[in-house]
Amino acid sequence: MVDVFFTDTAWYVGQIFFLVLSCVIFLIFVVALLATIKLCIQICGFCNIFIISPSAYVYNRGRQLYKSYSEHVIPSTLDDLI
């Protein structure tokens, strides 16, 4: 017959508790790391939406306006300036 003492049982329960707690802490760190990566990707997306896209729009619109202005305005001659 096997004698099981309370200290042995507590030691096994303690080991199981330690393993479960270690896995939970590891999962928390993994989830935090994945959330950080997701946040960085979202910030890069916002950078594209709020910085790169508007600047490209302003550049293209300015170029269009310059072309239309150049076509409609008659260049002045030097005789007009003197």
UniProtKB/Swiss-Prot annotation:
Residues 38-78 are intravirion. Residues 1-16 are virion surface. PROSITE patterns: COV_E (PS51926). It is a single-pass type III membrane protein. The keyword Iron does not apply. It is found in: Host Golgi apparatus membrane. One of its GO terms (cellular component) is membrane. One of its GO terms (biological process) is disruption of cellular anatomical structure in another organism. The keyword DNA damage does not apply. InterPro entries: E_protein_bCoV, E_protein_CoV. This is Envelope small membrane protein.
